[in-house]
């Protein structure tokens, strides 16, 4: 299972939110590159980089940070936050992203999102299916759509999508444990999908459980920044899997 630390960016700084609420912002580090290098030094190979300014303004903003981390580490970066146009994707990939995550666009403009899957390949495009009471949430979680989560994922699986990041908003940034039941349900109803669990990870013991469920990866944010899970523990998990 991939261990994928998260770096969320506002104003070029590394922050965390609770339940996606911009008013709960805590700045953890002024220098995201420093944070990324620290992850890499502990054997981490993947990074989930989110442009929260971009998510709010519906266009890519913090691509310079992406460029910096991609050029000065070997981390495989998936980048998301407000990607809406072909130009946004071009900038993201040219700046060094390995994959991009599209969430709101997949709900609001499925034609464009499907074109991306065809144009860039299913290994490059991740479906960001953020859930609120098993409905899909969009626009940095400021809106809830009418889309039911599992049919939404199944529909895109039929279009060729392979990777899905699912964040249960009720859990995100709350350090209350992940949505094991929700992930088990998704995995049983979408055979073959590479599911990346996100939101609520709070202790190291949850990681083997997610691996056992069959998750492809797990994104860890606040638990790292608040030392609930140490980088040493992650390093051992990566080495021993």
Curated annotation (Swiss-Prot):
GO terms for biological process: L-histidine biosynthetic process; L-tryptophan biosynthetic process. Gene3D superfamilies: Aldolase class I (3.20.20.70). Disulfide bonds: none annotated. It catalyses: 1-(5-phospho-beta-D-ribosyl)-5-[(5-phospho-beta-D-ribosylamino)methylideneamino]imidazole-4-carboxamide = 5-[(5-phospho-1-deoxy-D-ribulos-1-ylimino)methylamino]-1-(5-phospho-beta-D-ribosyl)imidazole-4-carboxamide. Pathway: Amino-acid biosynthesis; L-histidine biosynthesis; L-histidine from 5-phospho-alpha-D-ribose 1-diphosphate: step 4/9. Belongs to the HisA/HisF family. NCBIfam families: 1-(5-phosphoribosyl)-5-[(5-phosphoribosylamino)methylideneamino]imidazole-4-carboxamide isomerase. This is 1-(5-phosphoribosyl)-5-[(5-phosphoribosylamino)methylideneamino] imidazole-4-carboxamide isomerase. It comes from Flavobacterium psychrophilum (strain ATCC 49511 / DSM 21280 / CIP 103535 / JIP02/86). The lineage of its organism: Bacteria, Pseudomonadati, Bacteroidota, Flavobacteriia, Flavobacteriales.
